[in-house]
């Protein structure tokens, strides 16, 4: 009967490791031939303890975070970036990007990390643009946004504006916000200028011109951009309405004060009893003071605001 393999020391027990890390703890490289070690790729292994005592894996991202951590230990110039960094930070992404299982890394040196499922890009990343999230060295949320402006990201222009808006303060929306990743307009533009010339910089500057603070959801961003695509002016965001005496009224998603038009996106958060009460109060105030409330749904966005635009244009024509 074959003898059971010698136990691995605590740093490698139930972990992903490299040959160098095996050497560091004084264990023979032949140990990887045992049945409890899985080969993940060239020089990369995972230990599967026979007693089931492996620590729980991090599963909040669609790629193997333990493999990522090991690669970052092996390559100190590597950082998690692009779509993978966006996933770590919880930035709003289209469905296909949320589930992208490739591990995106940026390296400073010419030698790429050639492994299945790993996409590497060679570019310099300023230390000021690095953060530690979930134990992984990542590009900061702002740097991640601008890196994603490269055509290779696969994201559309609207997707990028959604991310930029999501990074902005959203304090006017009770119970909504991204917490630790919220920053100000100046922070976003400052990092963009620090990066200088890079692939996608023109698109990044166009995103910066259209990003807005105070946006409550990705759908509100897409509504604003759809209005712009339809040839209408950019509406005010998180607008505070006032009556004829200048007394402040409700705060609304989008507004055209010149034509007294309010545009509200009706998303999931409007289904709570408390929010419905606020919506009724807002609509009554608007009706009393001559403001038209136009509500937009997910179907309207899918249809390109086909049923919304005639209402807005009729209001504008009547006010001319």
Regions found by a protein language model. Give the residues of each.
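Short gly/ser-rich loop at a beta-strand->alpha-helix junction or flexible surface loop bordering the NTP-binding
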Residues: 1-200, 320
